[in-house]
């Protein structure tokens, strides 16, 4: 086999591949075997029809088509590897020449990674918010904990903010009932504005058994963002009775004996949360600055695929009905063109970030251990509420394990470079990025999760260790996840809070074009 490469642009390459017939015996054997299974001929068992008889029956062209389809993926992959082509997505393939008995020549155009010059991260300086665990933040955490241990008691009075109510809801548009907006016995905390605009205002002042009607936009379903007449009927009213904030409460809600000890632990948790936030801010600002200093073209096929994926994902949310999608856009006074423009902007940002992080990883060449990969898989599985083992099986079936490996590799490479930057807070104090992202010289740095969830359990007496966590990607708005928000910081060593669960808690429980030309290769080349 012979192959050559022609650079069409910074992000597009054309391969020309010539395969002599003497190399195609395995493909011919497989083609004959496949076709023999599809033909029934008197005097021959199924699958045992000789090659010459098959050609006489089906025609030489059918056999050659089968051979070409068998040959294209492997020969294309071989040419990509031999020529060190950094291909993205599937190629567009055309048969350029076919001389039966001599050779087959085909071309493959494919998007490729552009050449990217990674900037000097040691020259990057960013400014972030300072760490201030003030009394107000600590009191807010204490009140949240107190609310979790509150009890609900019936209130024989008009509704006020902070009450918990049971309500029936119904809605009409132009006199027609909206079935999907009808519900009974719905529990709701008045004042949290979690349901529909105008509901809390309507509820305040109502008494049990009363009804009120107001106008609001529906927030979901087929009539999302449409104006509707909403009727709410109040079933019951309950108020939350909070426990006294004293030593007894500390013993009830935590492992501590005194309220002062509990407050000290909560202070540590607030500081931990602030550190997590600061680590995420450092990462985002450093990455944004590095991208600002780097210019490169984007492969159009990759961008287009992400745009199409975003649109198809949203349409699927409406049951695959494109008319409903169009109605949703109309209700928001948005045209299809404007939506696609916004989707393209998002896709370009995603592709630009991923390609840049790939370039950083190629430059740093960080090693990814099995433990690091498994940690990342477990974290991602948790984000989807899945069992890690089940998640791994799905990844293997979809051939996506390599994608998560690449995520960890990008994260480690970026973490190493963030550690080289200069960081100050807005008060002028130096911030050491190594505290979050590890030492530049330490190849064993962990690239794990960002932004640890708030502690939901009982605080331990041991103070929380310093956070080294980082931000996670979770956008689901696109079919292909952006790696812009992948983890880059060291694995958190902060101990989990062990706050007791309240038994009477009142807390409310979118890579490349898939258009292949004639007899295109069906294997994707990453």
UniProtKB/Swiss-Prot annotation:
EC number: 5.2.1.8
GO cellular component, one term: cytoplasm
Comp. bias (Basic and acidic residues): 425-460
GO biological process entries: 'de novo' cotranslational protein folding; cell division; chaperone-mediated protein folding; protein transport; protein unfolding
Chain spans, region Disordered: 425-526
Residue ranges with Basic residues bias: 461-517
Major location (coarse): cytoplasm
Location of this chain's protein in the cell: Cytoplasm
GO MF terms, alphabetically ordered: peptidyl-prolyl cis-trans isomerase activity; protein folding chaperone; ribosome binding
Keyword vocabulary terms for this entry: Cell cycle, Cell division, Chaperone, Cytoplasm, Isomerase, Rotamase
Domain PPIase FKBP-type: 162-243
Stored Pfam families: FKBP_C (PF00254), Trigger_C (PF05698), Trigger_N (PF05697)
Catalytic activity as recorded in UniProt: [protein]-peptidylproline (omega=180) = [protein]-peptidylproline (omega=0)
Keyword Lyase applies: no
Family from the record: Belongs to the FKBP-type PPIase family. Tig subfamily.
PANTHER family named among the record's database cross-references: TRIGGER FACTOR CHAPERONE AND PEPTIDYL-PROLYL CIS/TRANS ISOMERASE, TRIGGER FACTOR-LIKE PROTEIN TIG, CHLOROPLASTIC
Domains (record comment): Consists of 3 domains; the N-terminus binds the ribosome, the middle domain has PPIase activity, while the C-terminus has intrinsic chaperone activity on its own.
Physiological role: Involved in protein export. Acts as a chaperone by maintaining the newly synthesized protein in an open conformation. Functions as a peptidyl-prolyl cis-trans isomerase.
Name used for this protein in its record: Trigger factor
Organism: Corynebacterium jeikeium (strain K411)
Gene (UniProt): tig
């Amino acid at each position: 086999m012979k192959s050559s490469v022609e650079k069409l642009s910074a992000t597009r390459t054309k391969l020309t591949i010539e395969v002599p017939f003497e190399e195609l015996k395995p493909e011919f054997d497989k083609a004959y075997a496949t076709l023999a299974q599809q033909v029934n001929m008197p005097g021959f068992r199924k699958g045992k029809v000789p090659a010459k008889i098959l050609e006489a029956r089906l025609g030489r062209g059918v056999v050659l088509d089968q051979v070409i389809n068998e040959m294209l993926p492997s020969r294309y992959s071989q040419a990509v590897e031999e020529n060190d082509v950094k291909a993205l997505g599937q190629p567009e393939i055309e048969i350029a020449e076919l001389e039966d008995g001599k050779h087959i020549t085909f071309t493959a155009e494919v998007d490729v990674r552009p050449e990217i010059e990674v900037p000097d991260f040691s020259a990057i300086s960013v400014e972030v918010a300072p760490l201030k665990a003030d009394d107000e933040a600590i009191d807010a955490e204490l009140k949240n904990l107190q609310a979790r241990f509150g009890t609900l008691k019936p209130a024989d009075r008009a509704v006020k903010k902070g009450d918990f109510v049971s309500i029936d809801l119904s809605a009409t548009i132009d006199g027609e009932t909206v079935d999907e907006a009808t519900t009974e016995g719905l529990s709701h905390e008045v004042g949290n504005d979690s349901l529909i605009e105008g509901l809390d205002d309507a509820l305040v002042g109502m008494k049990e058994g009363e009804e009120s009607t107001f106008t609001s936009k529906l927030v979901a379903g087929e009539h999302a963002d449409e104006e509707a007449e909403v009727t709410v009927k109040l079933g019951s009213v309950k108020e939350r009775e909070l426990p006294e904030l004293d030593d007894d409460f500390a013993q009830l809600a935590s492992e501590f004996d005194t309220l002062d000890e509990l407050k000290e632990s909560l202070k540590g948790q607030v500081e931990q949360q602030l550190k997590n936030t600061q680590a995420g801010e450092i990462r985002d600002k450093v990455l944004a600055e590095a991208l600002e200093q780097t210019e490169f073209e984007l492969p159009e096929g990759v961008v287009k695929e992400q745009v199409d994926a975003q649109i198809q994902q949203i349409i699927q949310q409406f049951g695959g009905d494109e008319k409903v999608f169009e109605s949703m856009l109309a209700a928001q006074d948005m045209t299809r063109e404007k939506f696609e423009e916004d989707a393209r902007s998002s896709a370009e940002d995603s592709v630009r970030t991923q390609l840049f992080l790939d370039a950083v990883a190629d430059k740093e060449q960080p090693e990814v251990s099995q433990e690091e990969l498994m940690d990342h898989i477990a974290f991602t599985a948790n984000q989807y509420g899945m069992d890690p083992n089940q998640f791994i099986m799905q990844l293997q079936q979809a051939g996506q394990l390599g994608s998560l490996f690449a995520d960890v590799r990008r994260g480690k490479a970026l973490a190493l470079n963030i550690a080289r930057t200069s960081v100050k807070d807005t008060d002028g104090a130096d911030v050491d990025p190594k505290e979050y992202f590890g030492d530049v010289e330490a190849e064993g740095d962990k690239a794990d999760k960002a932004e640890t969830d708030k502690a939901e359990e009982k605080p331990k007496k041991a103070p929380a260790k310093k956070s080294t966590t980082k931000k996670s990607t979770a956008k689901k708005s696109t079919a292909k996840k952006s790696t812009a928000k992948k983890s880059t910081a060291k694995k958190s060593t902060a101990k989990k809070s062990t706050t007791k669960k309240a038994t009477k808690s009142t807390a409310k429980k979118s890579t490349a074009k898939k258009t292949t030309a004639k007899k295109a290769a069906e294997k994707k080349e990453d």
